[in-house]
């Protein structure tokens, strides 16, 4: 029998050094689960929705209570198993095993459709975990800001001689992921017009300083963009409207942005993309009363949206999919050339993945922002020669408001993750920070995801859909001693289109933690280098050889073995 997914209760993680659980290794997942549902973090916390349509932290409130209860009682040699947001077992393992193992939204491939998943969800038998919602390591929109920033910067390098001043980005979606776009564009030096159909989401981004201002109409928005680009100012403008209407209208008017993308929740047509001409309340009601008709209406609107994006691409405007599967939805509605513009990974990000570079993140369990500022300084000390990274950290401190527990995102690769993790652990040991640090990442990383319309689109060897890689990543992180490990399906692009894994490890200042950190923070990014080397990317082969990886089928890594 389905239990309640709604509770009028605000959740905030404990701060300080007083433990609710029996050790920091179980206190950490407890605090991070609670932090995912902090009103300053989650999109709809009273319904357990963290971000990304219906990406939840727990299946229902009864399951949430049971998870919290289990974590408070968990012993140092026990492991909690969580199945689609429901705690299903506690087993005796050992002290270096993960304290929590999570599997979310996984379906046998033939049944891996939204229709079947929604049936299970309605019966209380499943939960959509997105990527970091159900794996308890979401840190608000900051979690994707740097990745979006790196994408815009690389687009500027490729198309505009590395200078986005006086240029503007057209995009849509200001949810938990899309909400990073306006700030990322501003940090990259560009203006942006950000279309969002829910005023509450615009209010959230204005309050957290991710978007600068809101226009009253499309004409007003364009006037603001024209003024700011003429003045060379990087200002983000939000517009409350439907992208399915506005983007085609801009094509009709002959307006020419400098970059075009989209980050609406198009991956979930039943819950995440407002059909043209509908109000949000109407959409929610019809999703319950006529799900099939609602999905078709949403996908028809997506088709219009993608046709407009294609028109911009044909004008010569750099246009790219930002990983929400909108091209696939449009293709299913008859837009045969929907994939004529690329996804952001093959267009701009893959060379980073080849070196194991991706969204490394950490959180101060103390709740003290000073702990993050001290770790920022430590990153600069260790990665001493990377001016681009130092610039990012300076901008992040100046511009990014913490949401919930203080956190930082920082794209680093195989060469640095282990060193940083060990340094953070030493800071905890010496009392330089006031409580342990947790280190995790997005599932959007170099070796932890198979997603043919996003992270693994257009792989050199054609292995886009091979999902052995995230399974191996999860298994290796478990064997290496991560504090919690997760294996999900459908994140980012929806049911049937992705499989992906996550890990989190606690720096509690002990020697045992140092040994686990050394294994996990080497092996985890190394799987990304391995995956790309196996696909034939020379950058990855070179990185594997430089970092001493042992890849039996890659001659360059064998040396004198």
From Swiss-Prot:
Q: Which reaction does it catalyse?
A: 4-imidazolone-5-propanoate = trans-urocanate + H2O
UniProt entry tagged with the keyword Translocase: no
- Which UniProt keywords are listed? Cytoplasm, Histidine metabolism, Lyase, NAD
In the record's cofactor note, how is the cofactor described as bound? Binds 1 NAD(+) per subunit.
Keyword Ribonucleoprotein on this protein? no
Note the InterPro entries from the entry.
Answer: Urocanase (IPR055351), Urocanase-like (IPR023637), Urocanase_C (IPR035401), Urocanase_central_sf (IPR038364), Urocanase_CS (IPR023636), Urocanase_N (IPR035400), Urocanase_Rossmann-like (IPR035085), Urocanase_sf (IPR036190)
Q: Where is the active site?
A: 410
Q: Report the principal subcellular site.
A: cytoplasm
GO biological process annotation, one example? L-histidine catabolic process to glutamate and formamide
Cross-referenced NCBIfam families: hutU, PRK05414.1
Q: What does the UniProt function comment say about this protein?
A: Catalyzes the conversion of urocanate to 4-imidazolone-5-propionate.
Name of the protein this chain belongs to: Urocanate hydratase
The record lists the organism as: Citrobacter koseri (strain ATCC BAA-895 / CDC 4225-83 / SGSC4696)
